[in-house]
Amino acid sequence: PRSTLFPYTTLFRSYGKLCAAWFGHPERKMRFIGVTGTNGKTTITNLIKHILTENGRKVGLIGTIQNEIGDEIVHTDNTTPFVYDLMALYAKMAEAGCDDVVMEVSSFGLVQQRIGETHFAAAVFTNLTQDHLDYHGTMENYYQAKKLLFSRCDTAVIDTDDDYGKRLYSEVTCPKIAYG
């Protein structure tokens, strides 16, 4: 008998779409800001959350230390939760009236398509240093993993003090802002 094999990427993309539909597409109900890089994600996501909150926005936070829905703290196991858990979290945030979600987006989350169909109003790149090479194998693979975030954003904010940031700045096609 003949069997059909689904490529890994197709399977996870389809699963992400299914999870989003199951939860009523919460990723379409809020504005998202994603932060990626080896270091600084937690600091930057918390600063952005504070700025938005001080300007009257209700903000959800997804990160390494904890997830937050307004003032409620929600336990986390991964920097970027797996897609089913992420969509469930988005749904709770939307139900709680969150306007925005600020999230750390890990290289693992990007490669494993944990963020589903999430589109980001802004994506921030902090830096890239040697880390997770046991998973990615090479710095080039690690860079390409981080770069995936910038194919799904309206505006890129990139630290150009970093050599990989300079490269990313030259390669992204969306409107971009340099800092550093």
Residue ranges of each PLM-predicted region?
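Phosphate-binding loop of NTP-binding sites
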Residues: 15-160, 164-175
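Short, small-residue-biased leader/transition segments that mark boundaries at the very start
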Residues: 1-11
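Residues at the C-termini of beta-strands that transition into short coil/loop
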Residues: 9, 63, 179-180
